[in-house]
Amino acid sequence: MVRQYKIHTNLDGTDDKVWDVTNGKVRFYQPSNLGLQSTNNIWQSNGIGVMGTRSITQPQIEFKLETFGESLEENYQLMKDFVNDILSKKFVTLEYQTEIFQVYADLALADVTKTEGYGKNGTFSEKITFDIITKWYTYENLTFDKIQNGKVIAGMSKIYGGTAPGNYKYIKGTSYTYYGESDIDRLSRWDIKEEIFSFMGILYPKLPKTPAGVRFLDDIGNEYTAIVFKTEQVQDYILINTDVNDETYQGWKGTTALNLFPVMDFERYRTRIIEKGQMELINLSKAEFKIKRKADFV
């Protein structure tokens, strides 16, 4: 596979429009700089240096842009639609894929030329430049189901057997459930092995008038942040997005959306950066996540 580029108008949304700028009728060529710039604070005296902090910045990306319409009219329309789609959004997302990785960058339009340099059938050959918001990150889809009491989960569940109370022993290799477990929530935790800088989630609450959401624990089991809501009516689902540029906290009941920001437990929401540790569901039957992990250089 050669390098593939796509532009997403709303990567986290259901109305995402995708422009295939590798194989479509609007194409990108010759990126100016997909790398990074590093500024190092170094103190030197007589040739002896002391290394201070390092600041990483992401330079603008410039592409050569060409249209491949079959007529002058179509090429004008392609150019107009593409630029207007980008301008209609606060930012767009560049998908960059090769045989060995797939990463994303959030971009804001900085400059696009219009030199009217026609080619065959009135094709355009221009330059387009983007400012960098976030570059690069991976984007993963994850689904979590809460463990239920009495539910058999192959390879995970265990059974303790015996003939008298207080004399139960674990039977190795048997996949059964923790039937009768009084604290089933303690089994519904998932490991987080790498830092997550933002995520979008769809949460499915169970009980009304009971806090619902997710909480995050550090390596030693202490809660350091949580996104929890308390509503009078149980919501069909809760939509959250912790991206600072696209933040959302919405409850949905049928076709009615409710802003849940006022009913968030702010004392527990201490940071949007998710560290290595564990995640736990609170009063949820299921949760679906799209998570973003930072990768400065690929």
UniProtKB/Swiss-Prot annotation:
One of its GO terms (cellular component) is virus tail. One of its GO terms (biological process) is symbiont genome ejection through host cell envelope, long flexible tail mechanism. Its main location: virion. Keywords: Viral genome ejection through host cell envelope, Viral long flexible tail ejection system, Viral penetration into host cytoplasm, Viral tail protein, Virion, Virus entry into host cell. It is found in: Virion. InterPro entries: Dit_C, Dit_N. Pfam families: Dit_C, Dit_N. Forms the distal part of the tail. Self-associates as two rings organized back to back, with a central channel allowing DNA ejection. Belongs to the skunalikevirus distal tail protein family. Homohexamer. Interacts with the receptor binding protein. This is Distal tail protein. It comes from Lactococcus phage p2 (Lactococcus lactis bacteriophage p2). The lineage of its organism: Viruses, Duplodnaviria, Heunggongvirae, Uroviricota, Caudoviricetes.
